[in-house]
Amino acid sequence: MKIKSSSSHFAIPNPRGPMERKKRSITQLISQEAITNKILLLRGKKAMLDRDLAKLYGVTTGNLNKAVKRNIERFPEDFMFQLTKDEEESLRFQFGSLKRGQHTKYLPCVFTEQGVAMLSSVLRSKRAIQVNIAIMRVFVRLKEIISTHKELAYKLNELE
């Protein structure tokens, strides 16, 4: 078994073949922390901006939104909604995101966890599948963390 090397890193051949290597590299590029940092609390729901999802999926925001509009019946209001002008301004102020002049004239769309799951039926590339799996794992992890905190708070209340 040969080990290929370059000046910056070593690559060990994958016994499962080149496709498996490709899948793993996409998942590795998208860290859980990077996804977690893109999840916002909007209208009381954990959600992600269309532009952040588009970057993760490797498509333009316009193409992502076009695919959604072609399948709009799959995205009810609790799966996807458009930010109001006030919400956009609030995000710009709070996070320095959505900087003026860098985005289109349209207000951003936001996808809840269910909306992100539904995107997998609209965006069908191999990358989209891997990205969706990674995002779903992060949402599950966040639920587990929240559940653990609730349990700890309950136990603390019992001790008092």
Regions from the language model: what does each represent?
Residues 1-160:
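Basic, low-complexity intrinsically disordered segments
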